[in-house]
């Protein structure tokens, strides 16, 4: 049967309890909104936050749908290249991209497609910079933390961003952590320390209704409630990572070993990456 539009109360309470236990961070069930996965979480969050003409900063390389989600919400997308070769955030370049129109920056760590995990020092520097820019412009700037790969780390610490920066919105999906891609279940979490957290949560609820994301699948809500603290065994992913990275670099390809997720971001050996990909497809590589 249907749950409430924002999700079953008991399910949200279990998720809030898990956040508090795992990360040592206070979470209120009444600021958690169940969604049809991370894509819905991002779409709803962006539509709740964005006014036409607002700017969204996206570190590059990035999951291509971010641009679609942001522009569909009426935002202007501003991309900032990550630092090479480690693909950590370039804090100075990000600071230069912030304007009085900046509403949010999307942070995806572990990252799709690079596999980079943004370090605690990186997140602390980002937080300090955004606090400074908020004070300079007298505006609220949010971090939208897209976290479907949070549990897929090969030993690198994955900072829990709300502990570093109050104006954070968590967009979480269980599809990767529970190996349930396609089951479409996740949540939005707004910390109580975020600016106008209750109004923002009301906007999230309203955006969910307007976009047709009313009541995430009930069966999957009850399923994840029994798995809130389940962590994946990443040993198979790590074995594949080591095998592919070793073989490809032995062949002369350039790549950085990913610290998380399950992607290997390989530099094209030709100037035209699309042309190289077409050749690779031809030979079934």
Show which residues each predicted segment covers.
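PLP-dependent class I/II
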Residues: 1, 6, 10-13, 17-285
């Amino acid at each position: 049967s249907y749950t409430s539009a924002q999700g079953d109360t008991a399910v949200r309470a279990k998720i809030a309890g898990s956040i508090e236990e795992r990360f040592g961070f206070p979470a209120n069930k009444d600021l958690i909104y169940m969604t049809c996965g991370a894509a819905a979480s991002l779409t709803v969050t962006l539509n709740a936050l964005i006014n036409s003409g607002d700017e969204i900063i996206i570190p590059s390389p990035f999951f291509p749908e971010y641009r679609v989600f942001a522009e569909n919400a009426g935002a202007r997308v501003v991309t900032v290249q990550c630092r090479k070769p480690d693909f950590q955030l370039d804090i100075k370049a990000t600071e230069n991209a912030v304007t009085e129109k900046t509403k949010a920056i999307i942070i995806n760590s572990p990252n799709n497609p690079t596999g980079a995990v943004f370090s605690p020092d990186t997140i602390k520097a980002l937080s300090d910079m955004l606090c400074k820019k908020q004070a300079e412009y007298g505006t609220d700037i949010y971090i939208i933390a897209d976290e479907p790969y949070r549990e897929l780390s090969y030993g690198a610490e994955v900072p829990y961003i709300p502990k570093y920066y109050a104006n954070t919105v968590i967009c979480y999906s269980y599809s990767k952590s529970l190996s349930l891609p396609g089951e479409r279940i996740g949540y939005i979490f707004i910390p109580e320390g975020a600016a106008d957290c209750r109004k923002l949560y009301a906007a999230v609820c309203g955006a969910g209704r307007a976009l047709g994301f009313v009541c995430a699948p009930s069966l999957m809500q009850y399923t994840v409630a029994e798995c809130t603290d389940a962590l994946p065994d990443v040993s198979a992913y790590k074995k594949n990572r080591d095998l592919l990275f070793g073989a490809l670099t032995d062949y002369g390809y350039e790549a950085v070993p990913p610290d998380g997720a399950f992607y290997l971001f390989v530099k094209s050996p030709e100037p035209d990456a699309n042309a190289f990909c077409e050749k690779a497809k031809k030979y079934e590589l």
